[in-house]
Regions:
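Glycine-rich phosphate-binding loop and adjacent beta-alpha segment
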Residues: 55, 87-151
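C-terminal hydrophobic helical "lid"/dimerization subdomain
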Residues: 92-96, 137-184
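Short loop/turn segments at beta->alpha junctions
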Residues: 61, 65, 86, 136, ...
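Conserved amphipathic alpha-helix within the SDR
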Residues: 65-75
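N-terminal Rossmann-like NAD(P) cofactor-binding module of classical short-chain dehydrogenase/reductase
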Residues: 79-82
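Structural detector of well-ordered beta-strand residues that form the stable sheet scaffold
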Residues: 13, 37, 103-105, 130, ...
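Mid-domain Rossmann-like dinucleotide-binding core that forms the NAD(H)/NADP(H) cofactor-binding site
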Residues: 1-63, 67
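A generic alpha-to-beta junction signature in SAM-dependent methyltransferases
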Residues: 4-6, 73, 85, 98-99
Length: 184
């Protein structure tokens, strides 16, 4: 949210609303973004995103997704789109959803090459593509303050608490998406 400079009145869309994406929904809302749009393939994840503050939740495989975004933004599309997945189709969709001068922020990590659309589309609409990795110490301190004041809710991002003796099982559950975990 800091990298994209989300502020009051921005329209924000988040692709991939698992752990990081769910927090992006909350932080964008706290920064004053309106509307905040969650996009994912999993209906349960989309429901959680709505509980966490997303104004709209759409499936990424919906063939009418861009039309729906266009309709709710009165044709403007989004000012900021976050890719919390890190694969080519997701980044392309983020870029496609951008308004003139819009920013796409890539957060998800994968070994795939970046493919974000045509130069024509980027240049005519003055779109921006930003990368992001990690946080600074002061960002962590701000998040801790937000937690202590009750502004940020991380309870839905903790799927299960396990003893250290079960760590192998916890990692296996995460890797195999058993129970749709976010954090164990």
């Amino acid at each position: 949210v800091h990298t994209a400079q989300v502020h009051m009145g921005n329209t924000v869309a988040v692709w991939g609303v698992g752990g990081v994406g769910a927090h992006l929904v909350q932080l964008s809302k706290l920064a004053g973004a309106v509307p905040v749009i969650a996009v994912d393939l999993n209906d349960a994840v989309l429901e959680r995103a709505k509980r966490l503050g997303a104004d709209y939740a759409f499936r990424s495989d919906d063939p009418d997704l861009m039309k729906k975004i266009e309709d709710i933004t009165d044709g403007r599309m989004v000012g900021i789109a976050f890719d919390a997945v890190g694969i080519q189709p997701t980044l392309r969709a983020c870029v496609e959803s951008l308004d003139i001068n819009g920013k796409a922020v890539s957060i998800g990590l994968s070994p795939q090459n970046i493919d974000a659309g045509t130069f024509l589309e980027f240049n005519l609409k003055k779109k921006q593509l930003l990368g992001h990795l990690g946080y600074k110490r002061q960002d962590i301190a701000r998040l801790a303050d937000m937690l202590s004041y009750g502004r940020l809710d991380l309870t839905e991002s903790i799927s299960k608490i396990i003893p250290l003796t079960d760590i192998k099982q916890g990692i296996d559950d995460l890797e195999n998406h058993r129970g749709n975990p976010i954090r164990i």
